[in-house]
Amino acid sequence: IIDVVSIWKINDEKLLLICNTKNKNLLIEWIDKFTFDEEIHLKESNNYELIHTFTDSRTINFENFDLAGSNIKQFSDQFESFFISKTSFFNQHETVDFLFDKELSEEVNNILLSQDFKELNNDKFLSFKIKNIIPYGQNEFNLSFNPLELNLIHLIDFEKGCYIGQEVIARLDTYDKVQKKLIMLNKINSADLINSSGSQITSEDKDNCMIIVRKKFINL
């Protein structure tokens, strides 16, 4: 995996690719390398901020807000360059994401907090991510793992187009040859599995860890 990105179609002429900051340079290199006849121009931007809003539930249902599917809505009555979309983390845990100009950061944060949104610090979000087995960031998205090991089969299109690694991933899936899997373990109760051959912790907090383990060592 080079990275997993979200694409925001702002208009017919402009797409925003949201990527992991630490994977940015490698991602740009690969896009440039495999862009041939298409008229695509990449411009790096650090002008936007992205906020995920979510609940403990995996699904979000709206009663008074029309945001179907993953359509992007733009709000320009109060803020300029403010976009909102219903989407999900990479484990399909649904979120509502806000994308906006960084100059609005303090104002947007204050509005959300005034509406009883709770802000998670890095440690709390890390624990949430581990508990829900959400691959997120360079620890999971790197050249050491393939999408099937990270439970990302829902992001793979086995029919559309022709892309690097497509044939390898298709064979792994068709013949059930994926040997590893990303799971969550309690660090105290699972010492043997954590220390088993081929296991690799990707993220951890005080009590639990998200770890790649060989499937033969777990009951599936």
Segments the model singles out, each with a brief description of its role:
Residues I1, V5, N122, L126-F128, ...:
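Glycine-rich, small/acidic residue-mixed loop/short-helix segments
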Residues S6-P135:
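Acidic, low-complexity central loop/insert segments
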